[in-house]
Amino acid sequence: MDNQFIFKYSWETLPKKWVKKMERSEHGNRFDTNTDYLFQLLCFLKLHTYTRVQVLIDICGVDYPSRKRRFEVVYNLLSTRYNSRIRVQTSADEVTRISSVVSLFPSAGWWEREVWDMFGVSFINHPDLRRILTDYGFEGHPLRKDFPLSGYVEVRYDDPEKRVVSEPIEMTQEFRYFDFASPWEQRSDG
């Protein structure tokens, strides 16, 4: 069995409402699904005889601010039995919650926490959804495209006080001169 068989079999077997779009390539299969059917689709891929996905390699997020459902959540899966890679993608906005897959793949707990911490995508029924990479008092989600590059606060160690200090960052500038003339144009002074 190969990617082509798994693709054809999945296309013929899966309910059409579970999958918005399917693509096949030599590197693996891709399924686009709605957040409402994500858990059912992953359950099918894990438990069905002709797919047998045993490994959740990674869950990652992508921010597309121009889209209505701006966050893309990507599940990278591996079937060691059939030597096949499968990528499942779903989209969410700021308020849409995605079903947690920790009950199917226990390792998903860490990756769902990372996606929540970095992008703010929330997962329903996650046993411990809290920050994993940023500090507990951190405000915002740093991998969103609208998050400022310098952040909102500066965190530094103050040696005289022997403690960590958080200070708001001043982002405004009092004066800035822009020279709009091109350096390649010849100036004629007279």
Curated annotation (Swiss-Prot):
GO molecular function: NADH dehydrogenase (ubiquinone) activity
Gene Ontology CC: mitochondrial inner membrane; respiratory chain complex I
EC class name: translocase
Membrane topology: Peripheral membrane protein
Keywords assigned by UniProt, alphabetized: Electron transport, Membrane, Mitochondrion, Mitochondrion inner membrane, NAD, Oxidoreductase, Respiratory chain, Translocase, Transport, Ubiquinone
Keyword NAD: yes
Keyword DNA repair among record annotations: no
Disulfide bond residue pairs: none
Compartments where found: Mitochondrion inner membrane
Catalytic activity, EC: 7.1.1.2
Predominant location category: mitochondrion
Organism superkingdom: Eukaryota
Catalytic reaction(s) noted: a ubiquinone + NADH + 5 H(+)(in) = a ubiquinol + NAD(+) + 4 H(+)(out)
Assembly and interaction partners: Complex I is composed of at least 49 different subunits. This is a component of the iron-sulfur (IP) fragment of the enzyme.
Role of this protein: Core subunit of the mitochondrial membrane respiratory chain NADH dehydrogenase (Complex I) that is believed to belong to the minimal assembly required for catalysis. Complex I functions in the transfer of electrons from NADH to the respiratory chain. The immediate electron acceptor for the enzyme is believed to be ubiquinone.
Similarity comment: family membership: Belongs to the complex I 30 kDa subunit family.
Protein name (database record): NADH dehydrogenase [ubiquinone] iron-sulfur protein 3
UniProt gene name: NAD9
